[in-house]
């Protein structure tokens, strides 16, 4: 599992309430699937397992989305398939995990990439089922759109072929969780606070509704516009919940400043006010997130961030751009100073480090932690094969007996070390672990690792080690000959 993806997985995991199924969600089986897909132009299909926690969490939101679409008289259908009872369908559409959601347009499936909240599901299927960009001809039409769609993005360009207009259309074609339109007149543009060429984002969230604009001169490339849209689709500070998680981490802005605090704390109101003030200053550069320590489901995120609940309030910055990187403020740095320091590249990574166990060298598989990693793995006199793992990772657990047996094979060879490092407790600045398990070998005489991506069995592991170190028996004989000389 990708480490970045696993972080997102932690964010979206929670247990949903048990509610009655909606009659507006079609129940599909192998007997009626083809008929339903071919008989409706737009169908969103959820493949689920009854025992799946994430499926249970999604169910009420999925049902609500179906009900809303029905109320609006939409032609879009929402359906579900119990993949455990319809395994032929699950196999046909390559269902590898639950829930898997596919969108069928005229019978052709594409992967659902939207969020898990009701409004996000509705907005996504509407976007996919209609034109990429709609022309809004009147203020009344704009108001109607605002009433039906949580996020409306409105462009206004006097020159429809300008660079900014071209960038806008490209972004509209690639962003699925917002409704994109262009103003048909200056009057419509003005109703969205656009008094000159540019883009407005209108977010309708009850008391937290907001209209934000960006001028044409600032629309210089698609990445910049996507990041601006991501920032302003969210509140200045967004509380992490099951509904908001996908929207927080799923956009194009991959930098996050977390305020970790109990909402029940007496200092909460004052602290969140200061955090929000800073968030508004850095709105399009970093996403500001509130994490409530009192919410039980947030415990694993605290673990990921390396924050003890007893030591809160606290704050951390996380980047998911290329790989996972975490930062914590220096002593005395307030929210603004820390954010500035990070954005200017002055903040050092916050790397976890486990204490070295006294018996780290007692078994054939040597235990590495941050403090002894360089000494052992980068020892140029030895070939060192390291397993980077997570205790909760299923694939890592399956690998344990094979890795133990491999270590036993080379235990008498002084030139080969088989080791393991718990990457959830130890982070290394110069070694990036992007999946679990990650296997890397440092050949003798080299500080550059070789990644292993072959089959995870004893025979293949031995072949790999021997390629760089010679066979266990050959190395042992060579060592004995050297001692005799």
From Swiss-Prot:
Signal sequence region = 1-20
Q: Which GO terms describe its cellular component?
A: endoplasmic reticulum; endoplasmic reticulum lumen
An example GO biological process term is: response to endoplasmic reticulum stress
Q: Where in the cell is it found?
A: Endoplasmic reticulum lumen
- Cystine crosslinks: 52-55, 393-396
Where, by residue number, is the motif Prevents secretion from ER?
482-485
Q: Which Gene3D superfamilies match?
A: Glutaredoxin
Site residues by UniProt (Contributes to redox potential value): 394-395
Q: Which Pfam families match?
A: Thioredoxin, Thioredoxin_6
Catalytic residues of the enzyme: 393, 396
- Protein name listed in UniProt: Protein disulfide-isomerase 1
Organism annotation: Caenorhabditis elegans
């Amino acid at each position: 599992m990708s480490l970045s993806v696993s972080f997102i997985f932690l964010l979206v995991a929670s247990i949903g309430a048990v509610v009655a199924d909606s009659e507006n969600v079609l129940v599909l089986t192998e007997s009626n699937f083809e008929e339903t897909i071919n008989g409706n132009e737009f169908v969103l299909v959820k493949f689920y397992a009854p025992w799946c926690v994430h499926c249970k969490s999604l169910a009420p939101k999925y049902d609500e989305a179906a009900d809303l679409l029905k109320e609006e008289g939409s032609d879009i259908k929402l359906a579900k398939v119990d993949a455990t009872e319809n395994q032929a369908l699950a196999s046909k559409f390559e269902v590898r995990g639950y829930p898997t959601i596919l969108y069928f347009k005229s019978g052709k499936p594409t992967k659902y990439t939207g969020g898990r909240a009701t409004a996000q599901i509705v907005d996504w299927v509407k976007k996919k089922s209609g034109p990429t960009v709609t022309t809004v001809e009147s203020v009344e039409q704009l108001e109607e759109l605002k009433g039906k769609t949580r996020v409306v993005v409105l462009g206004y360009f006097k020159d429809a072929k300008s660079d900014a207009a071209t960038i806008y259309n490209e972004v509209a074609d690639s962003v699925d969780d917002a409704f994109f339109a262009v103003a048909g007149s200056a009057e419509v543009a003005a109703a969205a606070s656009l008094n000159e060429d540019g883009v407005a984002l209108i977010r309708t969230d009850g008391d937290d509704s907001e209209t934000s604009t960006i001028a044409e001169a600032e629309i210089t490339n698609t990445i910049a516009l996507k990041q601006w849209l991501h920032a302003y689709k969210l509140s200045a500070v967004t509380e992490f919940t099951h509904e908001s998680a996908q929207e927080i981490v799923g956009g194009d802005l991959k930098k996050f400043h977390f305020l970790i605090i109990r909402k029940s704390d007496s200092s909460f109101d004052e602290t969140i006010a200061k955090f929000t003030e800073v968030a508004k200053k850095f709105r399009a550069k970093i996403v500001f997130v509130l994490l409530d320590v009192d919410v039980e489901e947030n415990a694993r995120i605290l673990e990921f961030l390396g924050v003890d609940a007893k030591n809160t309030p606290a704050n951390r910055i996380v980047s998911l751009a290329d790989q996972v990187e975490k930062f914590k403020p220096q002593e005395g740095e307030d929210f603004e100073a820390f954010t500035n320091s990070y954005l200017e590249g002055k903040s050092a990574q916050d790397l976890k480090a486990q204490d070295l166990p006294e018996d780290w060298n007692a078994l054939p598989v040597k235990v590495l932690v941050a403090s002894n990693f360089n000494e052992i793995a980068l020892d140029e006199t030895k070939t060192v094969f390291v397993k980077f793992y997570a205790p909760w990772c299923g694939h890592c657990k399956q690998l344990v007996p094979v890795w133990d047996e491999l270590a036993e094979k080379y235990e008498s060879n002084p030139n080969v070390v088989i080791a393991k490092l718990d990457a959830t407790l130890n982070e290394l600045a110069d070694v990036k672990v992007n999946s679990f398990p990650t296997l890397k070998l440092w050949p003798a005489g080299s500080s550059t690792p070789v990644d292993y991506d072959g089959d995870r069995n004893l025979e293949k592991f031995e072949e790999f080690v021997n390629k760089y170190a010679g066979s266990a028996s050959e190395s042992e004989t060579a060592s004995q000959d050297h001692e005799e000389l």
